[in-house]
Amino acid sequence: MEIKRDKYLKKLISKRNNGLIKVITGIRRCGKSYLLFNLYYDYLIKDGVAEECIISVPLDDDDYIEYCDPQKLSEYIKSKITDSNKQYYVFIDEAQYAITKEEMKNPDVPIRLYGVLNGLLRKKNVDVYVTGSNSKFLSSDILTEFRGRGDEIHIAPLAFSEYYPASGKDKYEAWQAYLFYGGLPHILAEPDNESKEAYLERLNSEIYIRDIVERYDIRDAAGMETLMKVIASAIGSLSNAQKISDTFNSSGDKSISMPTISNYLKYLTESFVIQKSERYDIKGRKYIGTPSKYYYTDLGLRNALLNFRQFEETHLMENAIYNELIYRGYKVDVGVVEIRVDENGKKARKQLEVDFVVNQGSKRYYIQSAYALPNQEKVEQEQASLIKIPDSFKKIIITSGNFPVWRNDQGITIIGLFDFLLNDDSLDY
């Protein structure tokens, strides 16, 4: 089954032969390799590129394990570049496997992979593409190391607009399946629910947890897994390392220090398993700092961690909306609006929350996620923070109800969930 990922394919095509290293990042199994080795490869072949001019090195494949040594990797690639008059395309998959633990842990130790990439950049007839599942040692470091000669494309799991047409279900069934099993592309190929659950559980234990534990040399694998479950149980809730540490300590089962929790959160974020949304003071126009919110990059992995037992559609919908906004390229923060209220005859400060402050260039939207709006009281509750925002940017409530887009007397736009998810320009209705 071929799933079209036209958004990302168009990005790759637009960056072809631009003299930069294309760094394709994203969580493991989100479709980076498929995009590069299938969709983009097929595009190049159809455009007249000869097969021998596409040099593919999947470093997570046992057949290529020797090329995790940067010296051997360099020698192998150079041996394939035999004609200076031909244009070559180099695909290096899961490049973090060519970075040693010592190189990661010790900033004074040069990362040899970067030397290999630098050498390839000097060749006029070579176009380089690198995929990886770690932001620190690929996107951030490469973009810094090559000073404007790196070009990142971040890949997410399937958006609902990609998942729904490929699922063969009506949109309501597809939505429930998407919330439950997530958007990793292979989930659509699993024949039944039992297979889907087994696949996700296997990914968590054999890939995500193991990868992070091994890559960061974590001694307490059980503690890392427990932390992932704590975050999974609290999506959409404000949290920080201290709160999570207190949760561990109060349970009496395990104690993990706050600095260790902070490191674990950083590792999970760098590996794209979770994403962090910071608090932003809308009136004060400044970031507040902790606590923040954490969302899972894929809901299926989140649900598998919790043995598919915590299915709170309100929180899952909020997480899915966050993921969709990130997929569309927005920067997403948690908004805070401070107001003054009367309490027992005295003025007091109160903070109201806006689920998402959404920015892209000069555009900004304020968005609330509301599972249902059954009555006017609920509408007023959801819009309470929005109507206190003293600017003219668009205020939106996204709800699971199925009805036309409309604007109420307070100037708040109400958008049905499917209208939002299935139309790229839905925020501008």
Give a label for each model feature.
Residues 2, 25, 33-34, 41, ...:
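A cross-kingdom feature that marks ATP-driven nucleic-acid transaction machinery
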Residues 96-129:
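Conserved Walker B catalytic segment
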Residues 135-151, 167-168:
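Short regulatory helix/loop adjacent to the ATP-binding pocket of P-loop NTPases
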Residues 55-85:
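Short glycine-rich substrate-engagement loop in P-loop NTPases that contacts/grips substrate
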Residues 2-17:
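Pre-Walker A adenine-sensing motif
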Residues 2, 157-338:
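Interdomain hinge/linker elements that couple catalytic modules in large macromolecular machines
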Residues 91, 127-133, 154:
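Structural recognition of the conserved hydrophobic beta-strand(s) that form the central parallel beta-sheet
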Residues 29:
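Walker A (P-loop) phosphate-binding loop of P-loop NTPases
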